[in-house]
Regions:
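S-adenosyl-L-methionine
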Residues: 1-14
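Conserved acidic-Pro-Pro-aromatic motif
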Residues: 12-181
Length: 181
């Protein structure tokens, strides 16, 4: 049975609590609405992180161009699958810690990944969408790997095991990060 909960738009949250320095958006399919609301804010978060979809390269690039038009000029592509394979990171207090499967990784200011231009990130997404088509979650490769036949599913399963042994994850979901200039 549906459960109704009260909601607020981004502008109302900022009016009540002030503008955050870092905004993490993860609303399963509604991230685009929050990105659109950023344009209505008089003061914007210095850094924004959101989950990008796997359905449309055009849609992902449109999100990045929208943020660039709002003054965000530095970007990152954070491939979540690599976080689980990364060596332990240093926490804010200097201690070592690892990311659990499914996490979004470190806060942007603690990330070792360099910030890049919009054109660089656009190229990365073009390559990523090519990889999605070849070996991504909805690809023929993943479908074949699930096939019970030794002949149809065997080769993709062997390739997956080979990649896992070398800690080379197949493309999974991705977060984008943007920083105001």
């Amino acid at each position: 049975e549906p459960v109704r909960v009260p909601t607020l738009c981004l502008g109302e949250l900022v009016a009540r609590h002030g503008c955050p320095g870092f905004l993490k958006i993860d609303i399963e399919g509604a991230d685009e609405a929050v990105l659109a609301d950023l344009g209505r804010l008089a003061v914007r978060p210095a850094t924004v992180s959101w989950e990008t979809g796997k359905e449309s390269l055009r849609g992902v690039l449109r999100q990045h161009r929208r943020l660039a038009a709002l003054g965000y000029g530095r970007f990152r592509v954070v491939q979540q699958a690599y976080l689980e394979c990364a060596p332990p990171a240093l926490g804010p207090n200097g201690s070592h810690w690892s990311f659990e499967p499914g996490c979004s990784g470190p806060l942007p200011e603690l990330s070792p990944q360099p910030w890049k231009s919009l054109s660089w990130v656009s190229g990365q997404y073009a390559l990523l969408f090519l990889a999605y088509g070849l070996v991504g979650p909805r690809s023929w490769f993943r479908a074949a790997a699930r096939h019970p036949s030794r002949w149809i599913g065997g080769v993709p399963r062997r390739i997956q095991r080979w990649a896992e042994r070398r800690r080379l994850p197949l493309p999974g979901w991705v977060d984008s990060q943007a920083q105001l200039l």
